[in-house]
């Protein structure tokens, strides 16, 4: 058994999730690959696997039960947070992980190939690239953990939205001023997240066109 299996299982249960042993094993394979590649490619500033478990895996898992169903785009996915973690836990969901950083996308493509994952692809491009917009089309859910600015994320997501799409932004503090700027066009539901062993404010913002 993986040394972090029980810790991940207990953490996911505290988040209200009932993940299968298979899903937990996949998540830990992903973390092991991230730790290994990180030594050479600097995919994440977090190097300690125990810290990674909390700040990457459990943090990403904390949004799982509040995400609407449907095809998902993860913008600025970096090393795959939260997009890859969602894809591993929800094999029925089609996911596209998008980032402009070649090293990070190479890591994700290799991991996808090694595990023969069928529901997720990784694309190296800029989110505003018109060819990418035309090729990928529209999504039901658009996630990001990467954007400092909520308004910037909404603008980046805009070309990928259909009328019912949900923008799911992971934030620390609630960006009250930016929500105020967007309220004429988007409804916003704020969900407080409680990540086990993480003593930081975390929130999920679900935005939808009015």
Curated annotation (Swiss-Prot):
* Source superkingdom: Bacteria
InterPro entries listed in its UniProt record: rRNA_ssu_MeTfrase_G, SAM-dependent_MTases_sf
Q: Which residues bind S-adenosyl-L-methionine?
A: 76, 81, 127-128, 145
Quote a single Gene Ontology cellular component term: cytosol
EC class, as a word, reads transferase
List keywords of the entry alphabetically: Cytoplasm, Methyltransferase, rRNA processing, S-adenosyl-L-methionine, Transferase
Q: Catalysed reaction per UniProt?
A: guanosine(527) in 16S rRNA + S-adenosyl-L-methionine = N(7)-methylguanosine(527) in 16S rRNA + S-adenosyl-L-homocysteine
Descriptive protein name: Ribosomal RNA small subunit methyltransferase G
Which gene name belongs to this protein? Answer: rsmG
């Amino acid at each position: 058994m993986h040394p972090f299996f029980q810790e991940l299982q207990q953490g996911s249960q505290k988040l209200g999730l009932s993940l299968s042993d298979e899903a937990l094993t996949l998540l830990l394979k992903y973390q092991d690959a991230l730790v290994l590649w990180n030594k050479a490619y600097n995919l994440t500033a977090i190097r300690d696997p125990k810290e990674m478990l909390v700040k990457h895996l459990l943090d990403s898992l904390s949004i799982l039960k509040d995400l609407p169903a449907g095809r998902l785009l993860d913008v600025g996915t970096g090393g795959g947070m939260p997009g890859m973690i969602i894809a591993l836990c929800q094999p029925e969901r089609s996911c596209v992980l998008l980032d402009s950083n070649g090293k990070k996308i190479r890591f994700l493509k290799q991991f996808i190939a090694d595990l023969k994952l069928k529901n997720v692809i990784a694309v190296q491009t800029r989110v505003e690239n018109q060819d990418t917009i035309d090729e990928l089309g529209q999504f039901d859910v658009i996630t990001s953990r990467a954007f400092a600015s909520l308004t910037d994320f909404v603008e980046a997501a805009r070309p990928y939205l259909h009328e019912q799409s949900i923008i799911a932004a992971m934030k620390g503090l609630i960006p009250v001023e930016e929500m105020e700027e967007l309220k004429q066009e988007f409804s916003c539901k704020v969900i407080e997240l409680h990540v086990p062993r993480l003593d930081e404010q975390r929130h999920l913002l679900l935005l939808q066109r009015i």
